[in-house]
């Protein structure tokens, strides 16, 4: 929905062009893409900002359109994207290559990384407005370059090679951290403009106060009223419309864990304001400052915050009297004495202990609660006394949960249940109001923002499906088509959530069923980067260049493009450009004979192709039509346990072996077989597993094969392989493991180039 235009008489061609643009922009507003979206401005106001020289932002525009459509598809299917925030452009490219459809870019990693002008630090959005867009520009540039490199290499392939080589989608589907917008409406617009100019299609804006912004999992968060958050969202949409980009706006709320707000002006926030119900208690501010001053007077000069304020003597006297009666001054004296005697306690430590006791005492003595809770207490008391009440307490709570302070007070007076209540008494020294944070407040904030955003995000203090469901159901009760996002934060200790491994594995899937389409590990890349660096640095110190050799072996195993780094970064395409620009006269190609990359093309391990050749012989003998393909990969990413899979032409897995190569104390290589399967009955008892084991023994130079928790099939197979001469001995130890010793002379015979012995093994002539 947008504000309707009034008819304007058109005279000149200039005005006619302007009105055409206004009409086109209005049609754009009215398109299905923006169904349910409210704009607080007109198409005319947008066009007035554009000027006459067209400026195109094709990367952001095309990415935004395609990304939004994909998110809508996922929402309809109740599925989701699970992603993380990369710490480098290489990580972003790898994510897309590994099939993660979208990328998150957070201010946490930007803060932790620092820049040429900013020190690394915590996530307080204290960096310049341009810093996250600058980080985003590097990611987008890396993705576009990866796309160009891929396109060039695919052009050099035959049609058959292209069909066998997957093409990766490097479009910059990114949702980036716009923090609080970094100020007022002009700052929000400037920030969004910078994101669009570098090609970013999505942005999240939160409802924290600029200047006091915290990471979503730090304390001390101060919210802004709902109307202020809506202004930010509207300003972002306004800038996107000016730039003709259907960007994806995510409205984040921190209301679940916040306890402060900088204004009581918005009616939607008022049900959650906390106030004193005992009005003879000195204000929270005066008591807090009097406590600080007491520390100062007792010689702790570092605690001097009271000097910022000009509290009157009478206020200090009233607050001091209350602190004395509550025993807080006594606690201050005890803490200061202990600090002097101990010498080891920090000033922050002794202050925090006393402050916690003060807060609990003040809240208790002031009867701190929301106005709705105060009225409910009056109604419940009247009900318990048998007095007639005009509304049941539960009915009142339902009403008060959405009522403004004005409406709630009017209703309470009508019921004869208007208790004393004052939120001004509970204000902090900085002037912030105290609020009742929690999921109900986060729901209220998100419902207010929903018509102005494409996706809603409630920041949470832990990972909890029940909390997510409560939020999703409340939002979808009023906005059934509203897409949601969820922070799978590394700030959570996932092993303290009470979830099993399987529940953690399925957590993103369960979120998708609730309508959470974009679920992300905010600074996952930062932790990946750190742990990988620690592991490699340790290995380098312990094992010298063997550490790098092991890394290169792993790259070959998983067929990582990092195995050929010059190609990865675009060496062949660069040489092609050099040839084009020099009329093919250049003799300085980077990928020529002098490139050490050719060393990485040398086959240092037994190739999978050898087993595929054996399987072709085997298939021919048994007249099987499928052309079999061999895949060797870690069973799970990062695992030392490997899986060798045999696949048919339709990519169905026909057989597999789960195993781990290990070395014993004497340096002998042992294959530890955990599981093996032949999935098609028609493939069994044809020595398929024998061929697979022969190749594994050859590939890993194994001296023995151990079968863990073996089955009867394992017993039969190993005895048959012994009869074929592949094993010299087969022993079963205590029923839990089969130990088979490899017969290397027989292995050598089976590996001879003429393949006579191998063919006899396949055809069962031997």
Swiss-Prot record:
Pfam families the record matches: ICL
Traits of the deletion mutant: Deletion of icl2 has a little effect on replication in media containing glycerol, glucose, short-chain fatty acids or long-chain fatty acids. Cells lacking icl2 have no discernible impact on the kinetics of M.tuberculosis growth and persistence. However deletion of both icl1 and icl2 eliminates growth on fatty acids but has little effect on use of carbohydrates. Cells lacking both genes are incapable of growth in mice and are rapidly eliminated from the lungs and spleen.
Catalytic activity, as annotated: D-threo-isocitrate = glyoxylate + succinate
One Gene Ontology MF term: isocitrate lyase activity
Residues the record lists as binding substrate: 106-108, 216-217, 252, 487-491, 522
Regulation acting on activity, per entry: Inhibited by itaconate, itaconic anhydride, bromopyruvate and 3-nitropropionate (3-NP), when M.tuberculosis grows on fatty acids, but not on glucose. Succinate at 5 mM inhibits the activity to approximately 50%.
Cofactor(s) it depends on: Mg(2+)
PROSITE patterns: ISOCITRATE_LYASE (PS00161)
Annotated catalytic residues: 215
Keywords attached to this entry: Glyoxylate bypass, Lyase, Magnesium, Metal-binding, Tricarboxylic acid cycle
Keyword RNA-binding carried by entry: no
Domain of life the protein comes from: Bacteria
Pathway(s) annotated for this protein in UniProt: Carbohydrate metabolism; glyoxylate cycle; (S)-malate from isocitrate: step 1/2
Entry EC no(s): 4.1.3.1
InterPro entries to which the protein is assigned, alphabetical: ICL/PEPM, Isocitrate_lyase, Isocitrate_lyase_ph_CS, Pyrv/PenolPyrv_kinase-like_dom, Pyrv_kinase-like_dom_sf
Enzyme class: lyase
GO biological process, one term: tricarboxylic acid cycle
Induction / repression: Induced by palmitate, acetate and glucose. Repressed by succinate.
Binding site residues for Mg(2+): 177
Entry similarity comment: Belongs to the isocitrate lyase/PEP mutase superfamily. Isocitrate lyase family.
Function: Involved in the persistence and virulence of M.tuberculosis. Catalyzes the reversible formation of succinate and glyoxylate from isocitrate, a key step of the glyoxylate cycle, which operates as an anaplerotic route for replenishing the tricarboxylic acid cycle during growth on fatty acid substrates.
Name of the protein in question: Isocitrate lyase 2
Species of origin: Mycobacterium tuberculosis (strain CDC 1551 / Oshkosh)
Classification of source organism: Bacteria, Bacillati, Actinomycetota, Actinomycetes, Mycobacteriales
């Amino acid at each position: 929905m947008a504000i309707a235009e009034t008819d304007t008489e058109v005279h000149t061609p200039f005005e006619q062009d302007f009105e055409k643009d206004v009409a086109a922009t209005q049609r754009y507003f009215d398109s299905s893409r923006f169904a349910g979206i409210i704009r607080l401005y007109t198409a005319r106001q947008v066009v007035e900002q554009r000027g006459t020289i067209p400026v195109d932002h094709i990367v952001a525009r095309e990415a935004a359109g395609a990304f939004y459509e994909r998110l809508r598809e996922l929402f309809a299917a109740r599925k989701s994207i699970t992603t993380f925030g990369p710490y480098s452009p290489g990580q972003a490219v790898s994510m897309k290559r590994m099939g993660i459809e979208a990328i998150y870019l957070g201010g946490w990693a930007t803060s932790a990384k620092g820049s040429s002008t900013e020190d690394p630090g915590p996530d307080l959005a204290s960096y310049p407005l341009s810093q996250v867009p600058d980080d985003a520009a590097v990611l987008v540039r890396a993705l576009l370059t990866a796309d160009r490199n891929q396109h060039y290499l695919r052009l050099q392939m035959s049609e058959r090679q292209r069909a066998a080589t997957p093409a990766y989608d490097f479009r910059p589907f990114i949702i980036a951290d716009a923090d609080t917008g970094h100020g007022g409406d002009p700052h929000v617009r400037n920030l969004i403009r910078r994101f669009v100019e570098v090609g970013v299609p999505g942005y999240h804006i939160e409802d924290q106060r600029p200047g006091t912004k915290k990471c979503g999992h730090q304390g001390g968060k101060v919210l802004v009223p709902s109307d202020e958050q809506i202004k930010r969202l509207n300003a972002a949409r306004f800038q996107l419309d000016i730039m003709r980009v259907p960007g994806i706006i995510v409205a984040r709320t921190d209301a679940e864990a916040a306890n402060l707000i900088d204004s009581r002006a918005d009616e939607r926030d008022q049900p959650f304001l906390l106030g004193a119900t005992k009005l003879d208690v000195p204000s929270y501010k005066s008591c807090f400052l009097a406590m600080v001053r007491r520390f100062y007077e007792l010689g702790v000069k570092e605690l001097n915050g009271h000097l910022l304020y000009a509290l009157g003597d009478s206020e200090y006297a009233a607050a001091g009297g209350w602190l004395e009666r509550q025993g807080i001054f006594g606690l201050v004296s005890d803490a200061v004495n202990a600090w002097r005697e101990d010498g080891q306690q920090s000033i922050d430590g002794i202050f925090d202990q006393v402050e916690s006791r003060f807060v609990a005492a003040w809240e208790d003595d002031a009867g701190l609660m929301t106005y709705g809770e105060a009225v409910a207490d009056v109604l419940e008391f009247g009900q318990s006394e048998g007095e007639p009440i005009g509304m049941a307490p539960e009915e009142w709570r339902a009403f008060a949960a959405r009522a403004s302070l004005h409406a709630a007070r009017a209703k309470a007076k009508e019921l004869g249940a208007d208790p004393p209540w004052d939120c001004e008494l509970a204000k902090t020294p900085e002037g912030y109001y105290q609020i009742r944070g929690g999921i109900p407040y986060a729901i209220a904030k998100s419902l207010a923002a929903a018509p102005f955003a494409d996706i809603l995000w409630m920041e949470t203090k832990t990972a909890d499906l029940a909390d997510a469901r409560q939020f999703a159901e409340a939002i979808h009760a009023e906005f059934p088509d509203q897409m949601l996002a969820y922070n799978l934060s590394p700030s959570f200790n996932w092993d303290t959530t009470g979830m099993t491994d399987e529940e953690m594995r399925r957590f993103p899937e369960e979120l998708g069923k609730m309508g959470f389409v974009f679920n992300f590990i905010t600074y996952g890349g930062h932790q990946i980067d750190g742990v990988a660096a620690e592991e490699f640095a340790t290995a380098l110190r312990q094992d010298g260049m063997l550490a790098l050799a092991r890394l290169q072996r792993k790259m070959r195993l998983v067929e990582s493009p990092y195995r050929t780094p010059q190609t990865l970064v675009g060496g062949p395409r660069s040489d092609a450009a050099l040839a084009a620009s020099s009329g093919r006269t250049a003799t300085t190609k980077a990928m020529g004979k002098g490139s050490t990359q050719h060393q990485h093309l040398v086959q240092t391990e037994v190739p999978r192709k050898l087993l595929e050749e054996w399987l072709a012989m085997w298939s021919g003998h048994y007249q099987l039509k499928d052309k079999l393909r061999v895949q060797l990969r870690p069973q799970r990413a990062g695992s030392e346990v490997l899986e060798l899979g045999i696949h048919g032409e339709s990519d169905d897995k026909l057989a597999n072996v789960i195993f781990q190569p290990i070395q014993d104390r004497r340096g002998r290589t042992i294959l530890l077989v955990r599981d093996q399967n032949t999935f098609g009955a028609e493939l069994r008892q044809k020595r398929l597993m024998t061929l697979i084991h022969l190749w594994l023994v050859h590939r890993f130079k194994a001296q023995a094969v151990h079968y863990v928790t073996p089955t009867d099939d394992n017993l039969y197979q190993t005895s048959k392989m012994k009869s074929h001469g592949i094993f010299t001995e087969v022993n079963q130890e205590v029923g839990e493991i089969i130990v088979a010793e490899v017969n290397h002379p027989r292995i050598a015979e089976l590996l001879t180039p003429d393949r006579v012995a191998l063919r006899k093994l396949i055809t069962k002539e031997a």
